């Protein structure tokens, strides 16, 4: 005010809410809650056989989606495969579809920081809450298929097998009009098939 110096004792313009007032705490704790739950989903997936250990099989993934009601059949899919440039191509196609008014899903790999980056809806990574909800839907069925595989003397579902089906469930729940799906390790035995 016209060069007037403010007394250092005067309160700041920024309002500090007293601890326990409830202001802002609910949103923060809810965000933290879902982030921690999503981290638990990621940990459960990472505890499985790694995605770079390809098992030449599709039947376990087929069994899992069958028990879930084939969520991947709810939307159209553009399947992107190749040696190089899959993620870029997937992103270009997904953006073009969005520009034409379609609700899109995008499945790419790898993620850099957080698992959610692999699964995007309308160009944005899926929320922690959506990831957790889909996981809660499929986890009991994953256990059933793992038990069936163990009874047949086969290894459990791998990281990528479960992730592919988790993605199918996330996109069905959204729901999306079209999924642009990047092949994981590629080839005939890729779980995205």
Region roles according to the model:
Residues 33, 37, 52, 61-73, ...:
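ATP-dependent carboxylate-amine ligase catalytic core
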């Amino acid at each position: 005010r016209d060069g007037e110096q403010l007394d250092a004792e005067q309160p700041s313009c920024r309002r500090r809410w007293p601890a326990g007032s409830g202001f802002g705490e609910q949103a923060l704790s809810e965000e933290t809650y879902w982030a921690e739950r999503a981290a638990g989903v990621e940990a459960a997936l990472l505890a499985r056989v790694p995605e770079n250990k390809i098992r030449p099989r599709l039947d376990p993934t087929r069994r899992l989606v069958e028990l879930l009601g084939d969520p991947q059949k709810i939307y159209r899919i553009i399947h992107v495969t190749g040696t190089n440039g899959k993620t870029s191509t997937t992103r270009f196609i997904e953006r073009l579809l969005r520009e034409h008014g379609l609700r899109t899903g995008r499945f790419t790999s790898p993620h850099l920081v957080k698992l959610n980056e692999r699964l995007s809806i309308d160009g944005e990574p899926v929320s922690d809450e959506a990831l957790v909800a889909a996981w809660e839907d499929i986890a009991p069925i994953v256990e059933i298929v793992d038990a069936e595989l163990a009874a047949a003397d086969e290894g459990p579902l791998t990281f990528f097998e479960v992730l592919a089906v988790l993605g199918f469930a996330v996109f069905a729940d959204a729901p999306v009009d079209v999924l642009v799906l990047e092949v994981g390790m590629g080839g005939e035995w890729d779980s995205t098939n």
